A protein has these predicted regions:
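Divalent metal-coordination and catalytic microenvironments
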Residues: 20, 67, 110
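Catalytic-core segments of hydrolase enzymes
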Residues: 1-30, 94-97
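A glycine-rich, coil/turn loop motif that links secondary-structure elements
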Residues: 105-114
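Secreted peptidase-domain scaffold signal
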Residues: 116-126
Length: 126
């Protein structure tokens, strides 16, 4: 779901916001090490590795940034879409979103939930 304290769209001038929704509640990820010294061995680090659940728009933003980076790598670095720009990336992300029976776009989810696999699935020749 969407966090209670997340803002809702649309914008005052009726632009659709948010564009897409990304996971930001109960996302599993690594927790940063604290108090580690350079003398710590790799084994000690592995033994002390911790994962935890995190919440917040910063988590959703990081996941979205990683998704965009992978999409840009596919388009520009791997030469699949050399004309890729921010508008194209936005269109790709919207095209690949998951939509779950609600009216889209809407004030809570925008065009749907972020789904990088969905982007590539939509680009695949049918």
């Amino acid at each position: 779901g969407i966090a209670v304290d997340s803002s809702r769209g649309f914008s005052r001038d009726d632009y659709i916001k948010p564009d897409v929704a990304a996971p930001g509640i109960q996302v599993l990820g690594p927790i940063a090490f604290t108090g580690m010294t350079p003398a710590d061995t790799q084994r000690q680090r592995a033994e002390e590795a911790r994962y935890g659940m995190r919440n917040g728009s910063s988590i959703a933003a990081a996941l979205t940034a990683g998704t965009v980076a992978l999409l840009a790598e596919w388009g520009i670095v791997k030469r699949n879409d050399l004309s890729m720009d921010t508008t194209t990336i936005k269109k790709y992300l919207i095209r690949g979103t998951d939509r779950t029976g609600r009216e889209f776009p809407n004030r809570m989810w925008g065009y749907g939930f972020l789904n990088l696999y969905g982007v590539f699935d939509a680009l695949r020749p049918k």
